[in-house]
């Protein structure tokens, strides 16, 4: 009896056969049959955890939803209550040396950090003293600031926002490292974990080098810019989104919002798209390269990670703290404006691409330490206006503006959105108000990642085993949510995986769920259908081989078949030391 997978492959193969024939005939082609999410059968339940009275099981994904099929929105793991006769064995507390003080939580600190007025133990047990404290900063009352406390953000390699910061940034190691904070106009104290905190305002604004002829080309560019993931290609798992580890409320333009809103711009009119990006950076930080002080809660979570590899436990840990942390980052705010342009009006008014880009920029710059918007529009820009609500004349070049803002307070960001969507351009006062609000509501606008397992103290019991399991878990995480489980697109379309759904991002002359149809309005109408090379999609990597005599191991993958003459860029063989 034919399996569901085999049946879908045969139907998909028939579809591509009809596609090749239909292309030759120049006929519109139907969309391919939908592909629903397919899961692997659940694993067996783990043994009952005597400390939490829970057990878990996991499953994997064999195919993601595609061509309007059901996405993979379900959980890959689940827990249930259980009971066991075994006693709970708590992880042993660290053995502190004779020169160390042991906090009630078990953390070891240097004895000279006792009774110094600093909270070196998170539980404050180091300050339970009879005599007067020996303050590192003497009589000065210095505190760290919000930027120092938030340094080290977690990063998820697939794009979601981790819920907690792994670091304890109220720890100073007994030092009184001071610096001037221009945002508070005061001296502040630098946390031990932060090697450098630098304040320098920098304003950037860029427009894309091209005016995009369709939304998919723009989305493709956005996804490439936001991908931390090398092995997984354009694979993203944003999820529902948890409150950021930065604390407080952040106004965020997530990549998922841009994908959803811009791809949702559907119309029968001929359109083009321009993207304007702006960024205000006011601070940067660099974490200490070694001896980082992690939070007690992070250490407790590490101690309870099972010494036998359990995918759910390690995946859950990475969802909370990230697959990586930020070793170097920049604080600030940024915006992206995506203009949806009416191509017919542009052609009628004979406006070229350079004029469009010039007229749609904000023109932000820095003058005497103040951020201003100083874009002087010339008369050529008078005709570049946003279509007013209820106006059916269709003479405006700008049909709509998608506004995405990250950083700044909610009211300032909302005013910025409203102004741009109504007027089509940025108001200088509204822009300045948003830029000034970033200081109190910053976002992480740039990050350089380091694997999260590198901050686990190697002197804690079982550290090496758990580090090895976390390395494996990151590789499994990328492999599980991977576009290798998608079917290829036609006519040079790019495959992307976003929140459990495979997408085909089409070149501007093609459309359809698989980019199977030629769209003459995307090019000069009189041009014949062009010959376009199909892009194959790599299948998933095989498991690694055993370690060979030359201390290397190997794996392989195949270029997905089904498209006539399609090829994949990259190597079919993988090799690493072991």
What is each of the regions a protein language model found here?
Residues 109-115, 489-496, 503-507:
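Short Cys/His-rich zinc-binding micro-motifs
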Residues 2-100, 104-106, 111, 123-138, ...:
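Thrombospondin type-1
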Residues 132-491, 496:
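Membrane-permeabilization and membrane-interfacing ectodomains
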Residues 56-58, 231-233, 361, 503, ...:
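Beta-strand secondary-structure signal
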Residues 512:
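Conserved HRD-motif arginine in the catalytic loop of eukaryotic-like protein kinases
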